Amino acid sequence: MKEKTTQLYEGAYVFSVTLSEEARRKALEKVTSGITNYGGEILKIHDQGRKKLAYTIRGAREGYYYLIYFTVVPGVIAELWKEYHLNEDLLRFLTLKTDAVKEVLEFASLPE
């Protein structure tokens, strides 16, 4: 029997600022439990805090940003996306394949 190989992913998630701290924690837990329920493993979560959005999303101008590194079988990503689209607390998400977990996040300064 062929063993299914997992892939390392970097997921960016933006949650609504209207959520209380407890509701935001539960919304994040919903995302992470979705990953683990499909046999994935959470490797690192970076809380980026509250930031201004590049454009208005559902009337929101700000959001809470999280970056999650996780491993999962590639076929599961489509199922996770279906769940994300049903999550009203999640304003936006992006999932990318990556080669390594970033322990420290570095951002370049914008030119003035």
From Swiss-Prot:
One of its GO terms (molecular function) is structural constituent of ribosome. SUPFAM superfamilies: Ribosomal protein S6. The keyword Membrane does not apply. InterPro entries: Ribosomal_bS6, Ribosomal_bS6_sf, Ribosomal_S6_plastid/chlpt, Transl_elong_EF1B/ribsomal_bS6. Keywords: Ribonucleoprotein, Ribosomal protein, RNA-binding, rRNA-binding. GO terms for biological process: translation. This is Small ribosomal subunit protein bS6. It holds the Pfam family Ribosomal_S6. HAMAP family: Ribosomal_bS6. Belongs to the bacterial ribosomal protein bS6 family. It comes from Chlamydia abortus (strain DSM 27085 / S26/3). Binds together with bS18 to 16S ribosomal RNA. GO terms for cellular component: cytoplasm; ribonucleoprotein complex; ribosome. The gene is rpsF.
